[in-house]
Amino acid sequence: MITKLIKNNDLLFEELYVAGPHVFICKKHPLASKDLITAEDLQPYPYLVYEQGNNNSFYFSEEFMSMLDFPKNIQVRDRATLFNLVIGLNGFTVSSGVIDSKLNGSNIIAKPLDINKTMRIGVVKKKNTVFSRYACFYMDALKKYLSIV
């Protein structure tokens, strides 16, 4: 769906990073000592996802696992609430594994998820658009942070 929208709207996707999916959990979570977490391991715990709004942007969800059915789901609107519930409820979310302890603190950790999928992280922009000097600076910093320069 997203590929079709990119093509039909004269957009370009620039891939920055390919990530294996990771589970974000509290460092005191019962699964925190595992090197690799399975979907089955996660069944007893609440799955925290971002609310996608009224226009149903399900297909743009950063949580590609939103297509899977977990028995306990909680929708949140912001990162702070999500991380508070990850800690307070032994919940989890799934993302790229890129996490910054300076921004998020040291209580949240990322563990690889045992699933044969990848996540393509990138930037969508209008074709023939030239980034401003500040946008170029930001992109360079982002690529450096992702260690792909």
Q: Where on the chain are the PLM-derived regions?
A:
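Flexible hinge/capping segments at coil-to-helix
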Residues: 11-21, 25-47, 51
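Short beta-strand-to-loop elements that line the ligand-binding cleft
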Residues: 3-4, 49, 69-78
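Structural motif corresponding to alpha-helix initiation and N-cap regions
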Residues: 9-10, 36, 76-79
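Short helix-loop capping/hinge motifs at secondary-structure junctions, enriched
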Residues: 28-38, 115-117, 128-134
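Extended ligand-binding regions for polar small-molecule ligands
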Residues: 40, 120, 124-149
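Secondary-structure junction motif
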Residues: 45-68, 131-136
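Beta-alpha-beta core module
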Residues: 8-15, 19-20, 81-129
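A local structural motif
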Residues: 64-74, 107-108
